[in-house]
């Protein structure tokens, strides 16, 4: 049973980004008792625009998930985590950490940033084969951070994954937030 969902924003936004609000709203509209919390990274709370180093971001994910699970009186394996772009990537890295693996019920990656735009040689996927939680990837077919072919290839070693491709959408998924929220809510309820 899923007790809650913890959501993290992309690098250039915060927890009040419209996409995270749409996900929260869609989950609440399922009429389940699934809790949702949107979490800001520490650099945003401090008013900085440039992200902290990866280990700091991963630790923020881990601490937020542990805190949410404690407040909901459940184990972390009853919690789905994820986020948009960098937020989803940091969640995937927390799950894949071989020394402090975070056991969760599922992972949602909206606009997974497989590589920087126009730099396909700089893949951010080495850890993905270690992600064992059920994973939902939602990406646009025109996402400049990774093509359909690139992301499909990078995630091929993962056993329990699902891809949803939004035709014509770029990394911003412009005007698709409600659709994305509904897709995620449906997937979370199905776990």
Predicted features, each with a name:
Residues 130-132, 137-139, 143:
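Short beta-strand/loop motif that positions the catalytic acidic residue
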Residues 13, 141-146, 171-172:
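Acidic catalytic loop of the alpha/beta-hydrolase fold
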Residues 169-181:
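Catalytic histidine-centered segment of alpha/beta-hydrolase-like enzymes
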Residues 20, 124, 133, 147-154:
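Short alpha-helix in the alpha/beta-hydrolase fold that links the catalytic acid
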Residues 61-133:
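Primarily recognizes the serine-hydrolase "nucleophile elbow" in alpha/beta-hydrolase
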